[in-house]
Amino acid sequence: PTRRSSDLICYYLTPRKYKNLVLTILSLIFYSWGEGKYFLIMITSILVDYSAGIAIYRYKEHKKKGISILCLSIVFNLGILFIFKYVNFFINNINIIFSLALSKVNITLPLGISFYTFQTMSYSIDVYKGRIKPEINIINFATFVTLFPQLIAGPIVKYTDIQNEIKARNIEKDKVQEGIEKFILGLGRKVLIANNIGMLWSEVENTGFNNISTPFAYVGILAFSLQIYFDFSGYSLMARGLGQILGFNFPRNFNYPYASRSISEFWRRWHITLGSWFKEYVYIPLGGNRNGKFRTIINLFVVWALTGLWHGASFNFIIWGLLFFSLICIEKLGLIRVLNKYKVFSHIYTIFFLLIGWTVFAITDFESKIGRASC
């Protein structure tokens, strides 16, 4: 806390034209403190995507060159994400399928890589689409990529969300006060609620589903459902609060998701920035719902398979994503009309399948889970 307070004082005392430089340095120090060995990955990502944005814009009249540069940028970002997050999952499945004994790579997942790679990809795509002009000032671009409040756990901030604030922002007393309130509320959600509820879930997890009563297993998954909400929404709220203290307005990431009356509505309220990213950069480019029901279902399948994989390199995350894909398709095919008529039933239906979904999300040992479910 003392370190962060001194950082804020340093930031506030810095003249406006140097604020981005100071903020970038502070953000890189913050990242190095947590992930020093991957510092160069972050720097390389900044340099590659900064250069790609300028090159894409330079060749905006030459579509082939522009798309080639965009593809190189995307391949780079997805490449580093694959190497650090998915390569061992891939090796493990190759070994199983072909009865091989390939050695796994001894690497750990860099903090925030799933977030900042998506942010930089959206930047390059937006430049190619002509939605924005490239950022010429590399310090401004580095500020966008490295902003420490949301670097580790989101929300996913697109360049279009904060481009005006990167170039010029005002530190207003009311906004700072509001930011402090959000930060304290988010910290309370994380420390006072999520951590304590998480102790119950940890007890269930450590004991094992085969060694506890069925009611306690249900209490455990309910605890996990609450923990993941208060934990993640707490981090997002702290990030938004810190952003406001620094003069930025990050997008909202949660909007009372457990009040939803359908799975479709839940995903409009939960991790909003991730859903928005996949909608804008995957679902709509694939055709969205413009080419008939069959193509819509295919497009949704791709989005939800990728959404599951984004959360982790394990089959339970893929199954989790495909579960929600199936439910959303069923709702689109007519169930939503029934849910809209019966308020109580719609809430019960939504919570029931969310609990099933969080069970899949939380537990990779499906054999014990199925055994407990059959009791």
Language model regions located:
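Membrane-embedded transmembrane alpha-helical bundles that form the catalytic cores
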Residues: 1-372
